[in-house]
């Protein structure tokens, strides 16, 4: 019985360490694989990441402030270009 308990504890420890290592590794990157529900709230597991709203078609994702600002600027630029294209005379748009 003692052997079974120690094996279970060992496996549980390995799983817990793996989860901690995953969070630590993802905190070093600008993007996290973590999705969130409250844009601009600090509810992400990494203290350096915030919940960022990318677009209506994508889920909000945890990332650094700088990456979030550049992603949102890119989305606005893309939308602006689409609107400008739609206003073009029809013969130029083809």
Swiss-Prot record:
Keywords per UniProt: Disulfide bond, Gamma-carboxyglutamic acid, Secreted, Signal, Toxin
GO cellular component, one term: extracellular region
Modified residues (4-carboxyglutamate): 30, 34, 37, 40-41
Position of the signal peptide: 1-25
Record note on modification: Contains 4 disulfide bonds.
Propeptide: 78-94
Location relative to the cell: Secreted
Tissue: Expressed by the venom duct.
Domain of life assignment: Eukaryota
Single GO MF descriptor: toxin activity
Main location: secreted
Domain comment in the entry: The cysteine framework is XII (C-C-C-C-CC-C-C).
Protein family according to the UniProt entry: Belongs to the conotoxin I2 superfamily.
Protein name: Conotoxin Gla-MrII
Organism: Conus marmoreus (Marble cone)
